[in-house]
Curated annotation (Swiss-Prot):
GO terms for molecular function: large ribosomal subunit rRNA binding; structural constituent of ribosome. The gene is rplJ. This is Large ribosomal subunit protein uL10. Part of the ribosomal stalk of the 50S ribosomal subunit. The N-terminus interacts with L11 and the large rRNA to form the base of the stalk. The C-terminus forms an elongated spine to which L12 dimers bind in a sequential fashion forming a multimeric L10(L12)X complex. Belongs to the universal ribosomal protein uL10 family. Gene3D superfamilies: 3.30.70.1730, 6.10.250.290. InterPro entries: Ribosomal_uL10, Ribosomal_uL10-like_sf, Ribosomal_uL10_bac, Ribosomal_uL10_bac_type, Ribosomal_uL10_CS_bac. GO terms for cellular component: large ribosomal subunit. It comes from Albidiferax ferrireducens (strain ATCC BAA-621 / DSM 15236 / T118). One of its GO terms (biological process) is translation.
Length: 178
């Protein structure tokens, strides 16, 4: 189905808006994927805040012109699905996880932070934990020395207090027995 000029301009404007908000772009070749698998991929992407689009490559190139994703415009050939996400790792994770279970989805590359990513770069980006997990790990690291110190102090207090606290109990037990 061919698009007229106004429809093409609308698509370019929509994708330009996505690119302006997004931190990451991932591109994958989807040749041979069934409709059911593509529907699952789209559903997973939506639930993770990733916008997946099948676009004409010329429209995609025009849409990313002037953005940080322009550096990968030379990779925009063949039947591609484009994943944009505001979260730095979400698009890479969704596409890489799906590609593990469906060999027909082939990651072509992507862009993050104004830099082009090859296939391995996208996979490395996908392996990074989410922001929430990283913050939880950081908080755990910060709390670890404090909780360790508290446990040591409690053990010292228990050790010193054990002899003092047991003496009145023993004296009371002897008084009751006598």
């Amino acid at each position: 189905m061919s698009l007229n000029r106004s429809e093409k301009e609308a698509v370019i404007s929509d994708v330009t808006g996505l690119a302006a908000k997004a931190q990451t772009l991932v591109m994958a070749e989807y040749r041979g994927i069934t409709v059911a698998d593509m529907t699952k991929l789209r559903s997973t992407a939506r639930s993770n805040g990733v916008s997946l689009s099948v676009l004409k490559n010329t429209l995609a190139r025009r849409a990313v012109t002037g953005s940080g994703f322009e550096i990968v415009s030379d990779l925009m050939t063949g039947p591609l699905i484009y994943g944009f996400s505001e979260d730095a790792v979400a698009a890479a994770r969704v596409v890489a996880d799906f590609a593990k279970t469906n060999v027909k989805l082939v990651i072509r590359g992507g862009a993050y932070g104004g830099k082009a990513l090859d296939v391995n770069g996208v996979k490395q980006l996908a392996s990074i934990p989410s922001k929430e997990v990283l913050l939880a790990q950081l908080l755990g690291l910060m709390q670890s020395p404090i909780s360790r110190t508290a446990r040591v102090l409690a053990a010292i207090a228990e050790k010193k207090g054990a002899g003092v606290a047991d003496a009145p109990v023993e004296a009371a037990a002897e008084a009751v027995a006598a």
